[in-house]
């Protein structure tokens, strides 16, 4: 009979009891039976248990992959996890009222932290393989997109990450059962999986292993329990042989007891943890013995200045030692400051403790190249400002590094404290720059850190006020330079309004502040570096506010370009930034030639990004070592101080176009013409070599297309390529007064197109009407007259002006196109002949010019001669032959030149 029908009813189960017993064989028997006869112990689990077990197994896999940083497998496991969670959603909605299980939120939070940690490690990311790097980007995007639906749950989890929910208790129970099952499998007995307890229900007693047989036989009647109790011996032993075999029920019972004990222990742990959470926060236990926090003073000790100073010296004596707890050191100093304030030990003692707190915060980060933590940064700003306010409020406190420790005074005024607030604020400024460099410039973190510049500048102002009251000239120059470096690159619109008279003349602007600070440094500084940096920053600030002549005069009078190569790298970077901004200023002030001269050194190298310290270009393997790359990264400028490289390149190319195109037209047939801009010339030539040129898309293509239009004298097409919607968005709208710049560009394009047109087509015209030229290029007649007059005066255009008729009369002094080509051809042929003769002489040598003409028979005679005097007769013969050959070659050259002149005259006559 089928096993399914064996327990159909009470009567059937009673009548077929023998048949059922015949199938209840133990797996541990000595004989193997078929699958139909072998007993299989099973547990009927709910859908929730199955789904949760699937989720926990995938989460375990993800954690294992994270440990070994196997990112591709982490990505595939994450995709499996999302699919498994989607399948479990109906169960979660029913059982958990739609609340996401906490263990799932924990997995998402851990995965997000892991991705952020790997992503922020830029050095480690470079060493990743191509597959890992690609998988990391994909995983980051998918996780960021996926966790948007769990933002509230994640935020609640991060507030209390150590709290565990009932669902996590179930997961722990599942994991413990899985571990026990592994133990049972070793003993040869197939384990029975215990079902975890349901959420929010009382724990039920674990059923014995033998009771599960009713589930295996699928006996659905409730009376089966009584039947099994009445026939214990018959159900336990199926045949006579099995009565005398070794019993396995004792071991199974022990295993069940073990499972029960483990579950009880787990519940007790969870209960204790919940009680501890109610009592207070967790404390991290240090490996080894627990280090107690040292007591500051004895209970009955009298707190006075010597005692506090001795305690301060004791705390700071551990500074820099190997096993010093730097966090504890900072906490002790803060506690000592509070004790000092409570007992009114004086402002001088408080200032001393403040300064030591600042030193301890700086010491916390052992690697000076890495930025400090944000919590320490906020603490540093607060302590620094507090110390400077105390110094400014008490004029009788003198704090200087020149004060010796034995001469410090804390009891009677004037108070002397050893310390250097200038060095502290300089380190503060450097740490601020490190924090900015560490952040992603396109993220909100960078904006948040940039807001701290207000507090940094405020701190610098406090230090500046203190040293203006009591400080040496050198100290004042150093703090002035720090303020200048936070001011020189910032644009002040009040400066231009003051120029136009829109604000009162007494209004103080950033230019006035820069003048005051820089002039003091020019007069009082005794170090070249501070003065040089102040001049460069001063020029940069003038150029930013269109003070072209002041900036140019400072450059010329300081002779910076002569000795800048001997400066340090940071000063050379500032010099490059100054030249770039000076070029932009010259361009805005219609000085195209000066703009080109300022930018040519930067752009001709092809590495303006590196020269301006705005990023590193990818190098070949051995061109830059890891140490050099690290040093260059430390020299990079923060993102908010960058100069737009596309704007810089566009200004350079447009300036080169306005200079180069008229020059090319004027020297079209000159074989020895020089290039004004090598970069622009290469761009133009590469475009001309292309067989098919489409419409321009990039900024460079727009400039090249405009140059081609200008060569034909078509100013309208040239202006449309330079000034259009796309170029306005990319380049011209970045200027302060963009409309004025666009008008200036259009005017220059008209003028240079006119000059190009006259150079190109002067041999076609006999005379040209000036009013028609003015109408063609939409320029005033006086302006056209002025342009042509300059060309005639500079001997660029061979023509004369006829004022009564307002025409330009062309003089045919230039060779025609055919004549120019013929002369060009003759020059090239001449050069070719000279080169061939030189090559022939190099290959032949002077073998046939020797005295013996290559005859080897005289070697014995020469060998017998006195070698001290040498073969003077042969040497004289060789010298005479060489002179004769040189005279013949010179005569041949003269004859060749005469023939060329005759050919040119013949061509002219024809």
Swiss-Prot record:
Residues 882-891 have a biased composition (Basic residues). The keyword Phosphoprotein applies. The modification Phosphoserine is found at residues 34, 165, 176, 185. Residues 11-20, 162-186, 209-235 have a biased composition (Acidic residues). Residues 1-21, 157-279, 847-910 are annotated as: Disordered. GO terms for molecular function: RNA binding; translation initiation factor activity; translation initiation factor binding. Residues 240-268 have a biased composition (Basic and acidic residues). HAMAP family: eIF3c. Component of the eukaryotic translation initiation factor 3 (eIF-3) complex. The eIF-3 complex interacts with pix. This is Eukaryotic translation initiation factor 3 subunit C.
């Amino acid at each position: 009979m089928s096993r399914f029908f064996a327990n159909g009813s009470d009567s059937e189960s009673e009548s077929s009891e023998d048949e059922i017993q015949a199938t209840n064989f133990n797996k541990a028997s000595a004989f193997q039976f078929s699958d139909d006869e072998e007993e299989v112990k099973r547990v009927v689990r709910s859908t929730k248990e199955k789904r949760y077990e699937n989720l926990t197994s995938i989460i375990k896999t993800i954690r294992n992959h994270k440990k070994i940083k196997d990112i591709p497998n982490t990505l595939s496991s994450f995709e499996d996890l999302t699919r498994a969670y989607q399948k479990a959603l109906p169960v979660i909605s029913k059982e958990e009222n739609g609340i996401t299980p906490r263990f799932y939120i924990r997995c998402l939070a851990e995965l997000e932290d892991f991705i952020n940690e790997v992503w922020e490690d830029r050095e480690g990311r470079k060493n990743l393989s191509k597959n890992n790097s690609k998988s990391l980007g994909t995983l980051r995007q998918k996780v960021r997109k996926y966790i948007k639906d769990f933002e509230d749950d994640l935020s609640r989890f991060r507030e209390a990450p150590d709290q565990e929910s009932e669902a996590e208790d179930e997961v722990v129970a599942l994991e413990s059962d899985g571990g026990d099952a592994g133990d049972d499998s070793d003993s040869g007995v197939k384990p029975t999986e215990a079902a975890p307890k349901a959420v929010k229900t009382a724990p039920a007693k674990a059923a014995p292993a033998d009771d599960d047989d009713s589930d295996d036989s699928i006996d659905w009647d409730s009376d089966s329990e009584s039947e099994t109790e009445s026939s214990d011996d018959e159900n336990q032993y199926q045949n006579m042989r099995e009565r005398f075999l070794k019993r396995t029920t004792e071991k199974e019972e022990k295993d069940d007891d073990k499972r029960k004990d483990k579950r009880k222990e787990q519940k007790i742990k969870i209960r204790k943890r919940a009680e501890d959470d109610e009592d207070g926060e967790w404390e991290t236990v240090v490996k080894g013995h627990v280090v107690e926090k040292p007591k500051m003073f004895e209970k009955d000790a009298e707190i006075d200045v010597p005692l506090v100073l001795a305690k301060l010296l004791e705390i700071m004596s551990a500074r820099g030692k190997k096993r010093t707890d730097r966090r504890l050191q900072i906490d002790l100093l803060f506690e000592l400051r509070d004790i000092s304030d409570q007992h009114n030990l004086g402002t001088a003692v408080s200032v001393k403790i403040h300064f030591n707190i600042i030193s301890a915060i700086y010491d916390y980060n052992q690697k000076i190249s890495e930025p400090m933590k944000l919590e320490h940064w906020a603490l540093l700003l607060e302590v620094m400002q507090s110390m400077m306010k105390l110094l400014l409020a008490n004029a009788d406190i003198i704090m200087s590094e020149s004060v010796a420790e034995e001469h410090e005074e804390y009891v009677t005024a004037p108070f002397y404290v050893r310390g250097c607030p200038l060095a502290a604020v300089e380190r503060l400024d450097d740490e601020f720059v490190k924090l900015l460099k560490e952040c992603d410039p396109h993220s909100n973190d960078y904006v948040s850190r940039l807001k701290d510049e207000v507090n940094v500048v405020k701190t610098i102002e406090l230090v500046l006020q203190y040293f203006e009251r009591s400080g040496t000239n050198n100290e004042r120059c150093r703090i002035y330079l720090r303020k200048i470096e936070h001011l020189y690159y910032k644009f002040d619109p009040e400066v231009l309004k003051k120029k136009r008279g829109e604000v009162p003349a007494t209004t103080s602007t950033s230019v006035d502040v820069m003048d005051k600070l820089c002039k003091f440094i020019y007069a009082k500084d005794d170090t070249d570096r501070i003065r040089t940096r102040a001049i460069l920053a001063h020029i940069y600030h003038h150029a930013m506010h269109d003070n072209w002549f002041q900036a140019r005069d400072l450059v010329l009078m300081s002779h910076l370009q002569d000795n800048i190569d001997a400066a340090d790298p940071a000063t050379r970077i500032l010099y490059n930034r100054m030249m770039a901004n000076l070029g932009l200023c010259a361009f805005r002030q219609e000085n195209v030639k000066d703009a080109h001269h300022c930018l040519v050194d930067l752009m001709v190298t092809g590495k303006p990004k590196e020269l301006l310290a705005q990023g590193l270009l990818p190098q070949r393997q051995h061109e830059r070592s890891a140490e050099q790359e690290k040093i260059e990264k430390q020299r990079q400028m923060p993102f908010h101080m960058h100069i737009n490289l596309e704007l810089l390149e566009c200004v350079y190319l447009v300036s080169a176009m306005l200079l180069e195109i008229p020059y090319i037209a004027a020297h079209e047939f000159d074989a020895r013409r020089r290039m004004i801009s090598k970069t622009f010339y290469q761009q133009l030539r590469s475009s001309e070599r292309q067989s098919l040129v489409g419409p321009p898309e990039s900024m460079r293509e727009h400039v090249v297309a405009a140059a081609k239009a200008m060569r034909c004298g078509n100013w309208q097409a040239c202006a449309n390529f330079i000034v259009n919607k796309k170029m306005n968005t990319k380049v011209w709208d970045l200027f302060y007064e963009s409309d004025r710049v666009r008008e200036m560009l259009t005017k220059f394009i008209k003028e240079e197109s006119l000059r190009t047109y006259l150079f190109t087509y002067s041999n076609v015209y006999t005379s040209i009407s000036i009013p028609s030229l003015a109408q063609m290029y939409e320029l005033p007649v006086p302006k056209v007259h002025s342009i042509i007059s300059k060309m005639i005066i500079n001997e660029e255009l061979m023509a004369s002006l006829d004022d009564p008729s307002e025409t330009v009369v062309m003089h045919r002094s230039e060779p025609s196109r055919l004549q120019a080509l013929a002369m060009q051809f003759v020059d090239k042929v001449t050069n070719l002949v000279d080169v061939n003769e030189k090559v022939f002489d190099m290959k032949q040598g002077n073998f046939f010019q020797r005295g013996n003409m290559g005859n080897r028979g005289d070697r014995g005679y020469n060998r017998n001669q006195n070698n001290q005097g040498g073969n003077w007769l042969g040497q004289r013969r060789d010298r005479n032959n060489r002179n004769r050959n040189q005279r013949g070659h010179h005569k041949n050259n003269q004859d060749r030149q005469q023939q060329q002149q005759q050919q040119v005259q013949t061509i002219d006559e024809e």
